[in-house]
UniProtKB/Swiss-Prot annotation:
It comes from Bos taurus (Bovine). The gene is DCT. PROSITE patterns: TYROSINASE_1, TYROSINASE_2. Residues 24-469 are lumenal, melanosome. This is L-dopachrome tautomerase. InterPro entries: Di-copper_centre_dom_sf, Tyrosinase/Hemocyanin, Tyrosinase_Cu-bd. Binds 2 Zn(2+) ions per subunit. It is found in: Melanosome membrane; Melanosome. Forms an OPN3-dependent complex with TYR in response to blue light in melanocytes. SUPFAM superfamilies: Di-copper centre-containing domain. GO terms for molecular function: dopachrome isomerase activity; metal ion binding; oxidoreductase activity.
């Protein structure tokens, strides 16, 4: 059976699972009892007493730690959104793993570690330019994405109602749904940017946990790591790596939007994907934000139409350039107050694209990440739906590569990240929404090699003359100065000589003053 066939079979099997056993949270925790107790501390293995792998020294059930420091920004409500103090609206106690153990039951290892005791360093997973992949490697990547689109996520399901309605009208049926591995990836992004639900048709839009603040870089880094690990398990290939798309071409064309890669435009309808591409049949989820707001509900993973791109009429818009990368990487400050889309001389804000590449602001200009999403248009143009387009994966992999390069060049201290007064979700110790088990922004503020991966890439450095050039320039300047100094001495000598000559040549009288009189 083909990979796609297996994916469809697994997806259908997943549909038969009882609702009490399935969530954005682990299935095992989405029971009425666990939700009422607000505790997600499942046992590891068959022994029910081995809670969080405690009998093996892997972890223990503990109270969730959340960031209580003040935030800034446009979100001014309190206790109105289920993402505040994440994930305390759902669970107060979760597994807290020790050492390099990780996962909702401490059954996994932290990124970059392996072995029965998670004490062995894994070989680094190397992310490469998608254009440098061999035909076989390219097909493996595309096959993995396609398989993930149609394979039920083995561990997690999504919530379809906000926290107050999670147990349904009778309080006896968790409002949750199965989804595929790739659609789960999409749902995570949607949930991080969705509006606060205050009532029918009353959304509060001034909130975003993964954009417009410092967490932009760490949130999307963890998002990719999560997908990469899911694809490694799905394919049985621990060295599987997400490639990147170097979009800094300065051109007005998408060179990954081909049928050999992520799909060209359809001839009879350029807003759709070519039927020669596997992605032409991809349907999207989490696109109807206004409808969810009107009905006070969440995206439930239902397909809502075909994937779209729309570059028609955008020929004047050009992608970022290598010079933009060079300027961005020259910014020494990670972020600056107010840690929002109007921060100046901020590497994060320049990379995200609210600022210009040199760190200055121009309300008429989009750059980098924001510019590329706008350039692709269609499904990619709106944050809540953008992750549906597989270009999202390679786009954000390259964005993360730039972030990693900046981290390696400047090696910032942890306090370069604001501990407080960033927008909600963006303080250093805030648990990133909606990842579970909880993980803070600080835990991802590292170089990529500390998280088990690296990039095969050479990014441009600031143009500085080499030491031989500097030495030549300095030597030349010294020679010029010496010559000028000698010339000045010579001219001064001539001036003095000319000024005193008449006194030297005068014939003095032997008469005294009194005698002349």
């Amino acid at each position: 059976m083909s990979p796609l066939g297996w994916g469809l079979l697994l997806g259908c099997l997943g549909c038969a699972l009882p609702s009490g056993a399935r969530a954005q949270f682990p299935r095992v925790c989405m029971t009425v009892g666990s939700l009422q107790a607000k505790e997600c501390c499942p046992p590891l293995g068959a022994d029910p007493a081995n809670v969080c792998g405690s009998r093996e020294g892997r972890g223990q059930c503990a109270e969730v730690q959340t960031d209580t420091r003040p935030w800034s920004g446009p979100y001014v409500l309190r206790n109105q959104d289920d993402r505040e103090r994440w994930p305390r609206k759902f669970f107060d106690r979760t597994c807290r793993c020790t050492g390099n153990f990780a996962g909702y039951n401490c059954g996994n290892c932290r990124f970059g570690w392996t072995g029965p005791k998670c004490d062995q360093k894994k070989p680094l997973v190397v992310r490469r330019d998608v254009h440098s992949l061999t035909p076989q490697e390219r097909e493996q990547f595309l096959d993995a994405l396609d398989l993930a689109k149609y394979t039920l996520h083995p561990d997690y399901v999504i919530t379809t109602q906000h926290w107050l309605g999670l147990l349904g009208p009778n309080g006896t049926r968790p409002q949750i749904a199965n989804c595929s591995i790739y659609d789960f990836f999409v749902w995570l992004h949607y949930y991080s940017v969705r509006d606060t639900l205050l009532g029918p048709g009353r959304p509060y839009k001034a909130i975003d946990f993964s954009h417009q603040g410092p967490a932009f870089v760490t949130w999307h880094r963890y998002h990719l790591l999560w997908l990469e690990r899911d694809l490694q398990r799905l394919t049985g290939n621990e060295s599987f790596a997400l490639p990147y798309w170097n979009f800094a071409t300065g051109r007005n064309e998408c060179d990954v939007c081909t049928d050999q890669l992520l799909g060209a435009a359809r001839q009879d309808d350029p807003t759709l994907i070519s039927q020669n591409s596997r992605f032409s049949s991809w349907e999207i989820v989490c696109d109807s934000l206004n409808d969810y707001n009107r009905r006070v509900t969440l995206c439930n993973g239902t397909y809502e139409g075909l994937l779209k791109r729309n570059q028609m009429g955008r020929n004047s818009e050009k992608l970022p350039t290598l010079k933009d990368i060079q300027n961005c990487l020259s910014l020494k400050k990670f972020d600056s107050p107010p840690f929002f889309q109007n921060s100046t001389l901020s590497f994060r804000n320049a990379l995200e694209g609210f600022g210009k590449a040199d760190g200055t602001l121009d309300s008429q200009v989009m750059n980098f990440h924001n510019l590329v999403h706008s350039f692709l248009n269609g499904t990619s143009a709106l944050p809540h739906s953008a992750a549906n387009d597989p270009v999202f994966v390679v786009l954000h992999s390259f964005t993360d590569a730039i972030f990693d390069e900046w981290m390696k060049r400047f090696n910032p201290p942890v306090d370069a990240w604001p501990r407080e007064l960033a927008p909600i979700g963006h303080n250093r110790m805030y648990n990133m929404v909606p990842f579970f088990p909880p993980v803070t922004n600080e835990e991802l503020f590292l170089t990529a090699d500390q998280l088990g991966y690296s990039y095969a890439i050479d990014l441009p450095v600031e143009e500085t003359p080499d030491w031989t050039t500097v030495l030549s320039v300095v030597t030349g300047m010294l020679v010029v100065l010496v010559v000028l100094f000698a010339l000045l001495l010579f001219l001064q000598y001539r001036r003095l000589r000319k000024g005193y000559t008449p006194l030297v040549e005068t014939q003095l009288s032997n008469k005294r003053y009194t005698e002349e009189a």
